[in-house]
């Protein structure tokens, strides 16, 4: 402990011996401006742009008054600036009547939207029973079509087995080729059947029209 104290004292003594030989540095004070308004040099590159505008002139007038040499009339906004300020005030600070009218229009729009939504829901609910019937009919037709296709394919497979004359694997290439040929003939037969039915229906319609109009079926005029 004593050794550490002596060491600290020796360091302090060394510092004390070095202190008189050192010289402290004191920066000079900044130059004082003359009392009164100060106007920056427009030609100086270090001059801020805002110091050359009306904002700086207004600050000088606010600090020094008439001694600043600023005409009070020049601090008022121009007619164009005044119109811009009024438009900005109307946009960001609307009057009470304007806000009330805006709220009224907003509430009317929301009420109209709510009524339209309720009307749309009511119309959809009124159509719901018929939509359910249509959906059930579509499901039934889809099921009937699937059953008919299944029966048709089973019949064609039976015909293919009969034509081959022996049991064959339905997945074999020969069986699939024969099945495709039978399906093609079946589609052709159905198409011809539809065309025949259309022709018969057209002929029946023409015959009915001729029976209702005796003049049309009579002999040609001389």
UniProtKB/Swiss-Prot annotation:
Bias (Low complexity): 202-216
InterPro entries: Ribosomal_mL64 (IPR018472), Ribosomal_mL64_sf (IPR043035)
Comp. bias (Basic and acidic residues): 188-201
Gene3D superfamilies the record matches: Growth arrest and DNA-damage-inducible proteins-interacting protein 1
Subcellular location: Mitochondrion; Nucleus
Principal place of residence: mitochondrion
Cellular component annotations (GO), alphabetically ordered: mitochondrion; nucleus; ribonucleoprotein complex; ribosome
Tree of life domain: Eukaryota
Motif placement: Nuclear localization signal: 184-200
Residue span of region Disordered: 14-40, 188-222
Keyword Ribonucleoprotein appears in the UniProt entry: yes
Coiled-coil stretches: 144-213
Keywords annotated in UniProt: Cell cycle, Coiled coil, Mitochondrion, Nucleus, Ribonucleoprotein, Ribosomal protein
Main function: Acts as a negative regulator of G1 to S cell cycle phase progression by inhibiting cyclin-dependent kinases. Inhibitory effects are additive with GADD45 proteins but also occur in the absence of GADD45 proteins. Acts as a repressor of the orphan nuclear receptor NR4A1 by inhibiting AB domain-mediated transcriptional activity. May be involved in the hormone-mediated regulation of NR4A1 transcriptional activity. May play a role in mitochondrial protein synthesis.
Family of this protein: Belongs to the mitochondrion-specific ribosomal protein mL64 family.
Subunit structure: Component of the mitochondrial ribosome large subunit (39S) which comprises a 16S rRNA and about 50 distinct proteins. Interacts with GADD45A, GADD45B and GADD45G. Interacts with NR4A1 via the NR4A1 AB domain. Interacts with ATAD3A and ATAD3B.
Protein name: Large ribosomal subunit protein mL64
Species of the source: Chlorocebus aethiops (Green monkey)
Taxonomic lineage of the native organism: Eukaryota, Metazoa, Chordata, Craniata, Vertebrata
Gene name of this polypeptide: GADD45GIP1
